[in-house]
Amino acid sequence: MLTLETAQITQGSFTLHADLTLAPAQTYAVIGPSGAGKSTLLGALCGFIPLRSGRLLWQGKDITQAAPGARPMTMLFQDNNLFPHLSVMQNVGLGLRPDLRLGTAEQTRVHEALDRVGLQGMAGRKPSELSGGQQSRVALARVLVQARPLVLLDEPFAALGPALRNDMLDLVAALAAETKAALIMVTHAPEDVRRIADQVIFVEGGTAHPPQPAAALMDNPP
């Protein structure tokens, strides 16, 4: 259970208010107008943006001051955040050890993650040798290998075509179901919400509203 308790998140002159609770093993779509604060919300959850006030609780424990790497979550970015000079194996391995000194067991975990996202035999390639969809799969493998209970996605597949984006959404949803991770996904696409979301967090007017059932909200949008 992740709770933002009467939180204020400030970036420059913008302040976002949030008072909400997220349950395990659910998929949340974060929607709202451009500039409403959707990415700001994810940044605060991950620890990239400090709370001005309020608390962030995980399973009842206050993690407001925890460093990003010490939080029970990982994030998948729109640009995949891959290092061009590193191999696929190394890019995924960063999720386990930033110094890339991977032991045998850790190397096995990386290969298993690559296999699970359909990148068998590509561990030695560089990102420039991969298609856009394959690069997205490398980034997803790095998320998978960390085995965190919360996965945050900031429009990670926005640059992909509709068919490939749907494939990636289905893969993310399947992996989350297997690992019982909660997904929190920023999206501008209503079809993405309908495809995989259980709940919707609507962000507008400086407020991230508590989750609502996705089907009901999409049938009666605000």
Region roles according to the model:
Residues 62-79, 98, 103, 107:
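ABC ATPase NBD coupling module
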Residues 126-130, 134:
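Conserved ABC ATPase signature
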Residues 104-122, 173-174:
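Conserved ABC ATPase "signature" region
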Residues 86-95:
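Short coil-to-helix segment of the ABC ATPase nucleotide-binding domain corresponding to the Q-loop/switch region
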Residues 145-149:
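A short, proline-enriched helix->beta-strand linker immediately N-terminal to the Walker B motif
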Residues 151-155:
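Catalytic Walker B motif of ABC-type/P-loop ATPase nucleotide-binding domains
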Residues 46:
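Helix-to-loop junction immediately C-terminal to a conserved catalytic motif
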